[in-house]
Amino acid sequence: MEPKFILGSSSPRRKLILEYFRIPFTCIPSNFEEHSVPYHGDPVAYSQELAIGKAESIVKDHNPEGLILTADTVVAYQGKIFNKPGSYDEAIEMLKTLSGQTHAVITSIALLQDRKLVTGEETTQVTFTQLPEAYLGRYIKAFSTLDKCGAYSIQEGGSLIIHNIQGCAYNVQGLPIKTLKHLLLEFNVDLWDYLV
């Protein structure tokens, strides 16, 4: 019997990735307060704590039957993390900082079912082109990037600002399929079974 998947996210990109791989799921966005988790300088540990918090929040609030999948993506550069910008001005500053530089995109995944918790993460290195300041505002407005970590999107105009990617492109979109495939095996679920 196929497991019932619960995606603990309202991210349209994560939904599209699951749909692309024909994984059936129900969406129950988490109410977890991400700002309640302090950042102590380790972006992997931070994103992992957020992913776990989201999964546990869904159990607490809804107690659904099924395999809960949550994820958290952060952009990290020189010891700082860049979440979703709080304003247009913050988005401009993020893009200025990342312009011409290489940063890490880290996504942590948490899978939770019947008190069994499995976690994993993926890191991708992304290098931006040198971005003319005059174009930053245009990019943010044209591609509505205020709801995206680091104030940018790989799939929406990413080719205008990204010079190079080393690693998983799905990770930069918010759900690294290779990592998810590996973690699902812990629940005896093989993604290949959905590709028929």
UniProtKB/Swiss-Prot annotation:
Q: What is its EC number?
A: 3.6.1.9
Tell me the Gene Ontology biological-process terms attached to this UniProt entry: nucleotide metabolic process
Would the keyword Hydrolase turn up in this protein's UniProt record? yes
Q: Which reaction does it catalyse?
A: dTTP + H2O = dTMP + diphosphate + H(+); UTP + H2O = UMP + diphosphate + H(+)
| Residues with site note (Important for substrate specificity) | R13, T73, Q155
List cofactor names only.
a divalent metal cation
Keyword ATP-binding annotated: no
Could you name the active-site residues? D72 (proton acceptor)
Q: Which CDD domains match?
A: Maf
The record's top EC class is hydrolase
Would you say which domain of life the source belongs to?
Bacteria
Q: Name one Pfam family in it.
A: Maf
**Among the entry's GO cellular component annotations, what is one?**
cytoplasm
Which coarse location class describes where this protein primarily resides? Answer: cytoplasm
Q: Could you tell me the keywords of this UniProt record?
A: Cytoplasm, Hydrolase, Nucleotide metabolism
Task: Give the similarity note.
Answer: Belongs to the Maf family. YhdE subfamily.
Task: Please name the PANTHER family in this protein's record.
Answer: BIFUNCTIONAL DTTP/UTP PYROPHOSPHATASE/METHYLTRANSFERASE PROTEIN-RELATED, BIFUNCTIONAL DTTP_UTP PYROPHOSPHATASE_METHYLTRANSFERASE PROTEIN-RELATED
User: Function of this protein?
Assistant: Nucleoside triphosphate pyrophosphatase that hydrolyzes dTTP and UTP. May have a dual role in cell division arrest and in preventing the incorporation of modified nucleotides into cellular nucleic acids.
Official protein name in the record: dTTP/UTP pyrophosphatase
Organism of origin is Chlamydia abortus (strain DSM 27085 / S26/3) (Chlamydophila abortus)
Q: What is the lineage of its organism?
A: Bacteria, Pseudomonadati, Chlamydiota, Chlamydiia, Chlamydiales
